[in-house]
Curated annotation (Swiss-Prot):
<feature type="glycosylation site" description="N-linked (GlcNAc...) asparagine">
    <location>
        <position position="113"/>
    </location>
</feature>
<feature type="disulfide bond">
    <location>
        <begin position="206"/>
        <end position="237"/>
    </location>
</feature>
<dbReference type="Pfam" id="PF00089">
    <property type="entry name" value="Trypsin"/>
</dbReference>
<protein>
    <recommendedName>
        <fullName>Inactive serine protease 54</fullName>
    </recommendedName>
</protein>
<feature type="domain" description="Peptidase S1">
    <location>
        <begin position="29"/>
        <end position="258"/>
    </location>
</feature>
<feature type="disulfide bond">
    <location>
        <begin position="154"/>
        <end position="216"/>
    </location>
</feature>
<keyword id="KW-1015">Disulfide bond</keyword>
<dbReference type="GO" id="GO:0006508">
    <property type="term" value="P:proteolysis"/>
</dbReference>
<feature type="disulfide bond">
    <location>
        <begin position="185"/>
        <end position="195"/>
    </location>
</feature>
<dbReference type="GO" id="GO:0005576">
    <property type="term" value="C:extracellular region"/>
</dbReference>
<keyword id="KW-0325">Glycoprotein</keyword>
<dbReference type="GO" id="GO:0004252">
    <property type="term" value="F:serine-type endopeptidase activity"/>
</dbReference>
<keyword id="KW-0964">Secreted</keyword>
<keyword id="KW-0732">Signal</keyword>
<comment type="similarity">
    <text>Belongs to the peptidase S1 family. Plasma kallikrein subfamily.</text>
</comment>
<dbReference type="InterPro" id="IPR009003">
    <property type="entry name" value="Peptidase_S1_PA"/>
</dbReference>
<keyword id="KW-0721">Serine protease homolog</keyword>
């Protein structure tokens, strides 16, 4: 009965939110490939941030249809950048990789170019990112958890420098290395950074480029979270790694996206509920990386450039395998030329004026679903 109650609580919460499923990938990470190569459906949230000449600047991770997280250091004084998605295999013979223009770059207001403190930035795409097997968002944790979340299966992904290119990244097949957090770190650590080390001592793959994402799974769940962005990687392979802790910046991410729109939220509202459920090996993967289309009055110049798609979670075989899958429709690319908005470190967004309007009210169909679950609760006596 408690198990049924837990499932219904999760479905109730999901039914009233326009939430997008995040942290789900089609590939099974335990399928080891040669030379730590990433398969085409692994890490579908990793993107390449490039300039207009298609020079790779840094990696980023998709958080939602419109938001990508990356490093501030790689985006200084950049006016025109794009995000190339579905990059697990960047075979030059395959020229059909989708790219999205960035119309807002939001570096952390306290980013220090000398110490590299607060080296984090948000990027907003000009049009909604289309999700499929090769392109998906990843979750991020909230900092306000009462206890650390149990994680497993942590990896750093990136492109390996070759002898032919020196320190420059060659866009090819994405690689990955397994890492673990270490508490006693001999490296000098900035605030809001953590230390990790390679788990495979025989690895000769070096992926220590700043900005490379570190990703882990929440234990007992098939749910991937963005743990951090590399701040420092040793030249020795294997070696030590420093990474910027994303959950330490969750409040910043939420505040900035709420101000610029559409807003994001971390998955910590799910944590206490999900981890207390009596499922020992459950596969429930639920998240709240969401935004409400109805809670923002968009400026005309921006709304013309966006075709906001209605998101609705697609539940598939919930009662059989306890997994919730999501699907989102893509927004059409903008036909209106929109100049990117840029944020200075201290002044915020130029031309601010977004007003919050209306109530975050349930759609009629969602209200009916919510009422149905309430009736199930009452009828079952749980």
């Amino acid at each position: 009965m408690a198990e049924l109650r837990g499932i219904l609580l999760l479905l109730l919460y999901m039914s009233h939110s326009s939430s997008a499923i995040c942290g789900i990938q089609k590939a099974n990470i335990v399928d080891q490939l040669h030379e730590n190569l990433v398969s085409s459906t692994e890490f579908p949230w990793v993107v390449s941030i490039q300039d207009k000449q298609y020079t790779h600047l840094a990696f980023g991770c998709i958080l939602s249809e419109f938001w990508i997280l990356s490093t501030a250091s790689a985006l200084q004084n950049r006016k025109e950048v794009i995000a190339v998605v579905g990059i697990a295999n960047m075979d030059p013979r395959n020229a059909d990789h989708k790219e999205y223009s960035i119309n807002a770059i939001i570096p952390h207001e306290n980013f220090n170019n000398n110490s590299m403190r607060n080296n984090i930035a948000l990027l907003r795409t000009d049009s909604a990112i289309h999700f499929d097997d090769l392109v998906q968002p990843i979750c991020f944790l909230g900092k306000s958890l009462h206890k650390p979340t149990a994680l497993k299966n942590c990896w750093v992904a990136g492109w390996n420098p070759t002898s032919a290119t020196g320190n420059h990244m060659t866009m090819s097949i994405l690689r990955r290395i397994s890492v673990n957090d270490i508490e006693v770190c001999p490296l000098h650590r900035q605030q809001k950074t953590e230390c990790a080390s390679h788990t495979n001592k025989d690895s000769n793959v070096c992926l220590g480029e700043p900005g490379n994402p570190m990703m882990c799974q929440v234990k007992k769940l098939d749910l991937w979270i963005l743990r951090g962005l590399l701040a420092y990687g040793s030249d020795l392979c294997p070696g030590l790694l420093l990474y910027t802790s994303v959950d330490d910046y969750s409040n910043w991410i939420i505040a900035k996206t709420r101000k610029a729109g559409p807003p994001l939220s971390s998955i910590h509202p799910w944590e206490k509920l999900v981890l207390e459920l009596p499922f020992h090996q459950s596969n429930i993967a639920l998240t709240k990386n969401s935004y409400s289309v109805h809670s923002y009055a968009w400026p005309q110049s921006y709304s013309q450039g966006l075709r906001m798609s209605t998101m609705y979670d697609k539940q598939k075989d919930v009662w059989q395998n306890l997994r919730v899958n999501g699907q989102q429709e893509a927004g059409r690319p903008s036909n209106v030329a929109i100049q990117p908005m840029y944020y200075d470190y201290y002044g915020g967004e130029a031309g601010e004026g977004r007003a919050v309007a209306g109530q975050n009210r349930l759609h009629w169909s969602q209200e009916r679903i919510l009422m149905s679950f309430v009736l199930v609760f009452l009828g079952s006596g749980v």
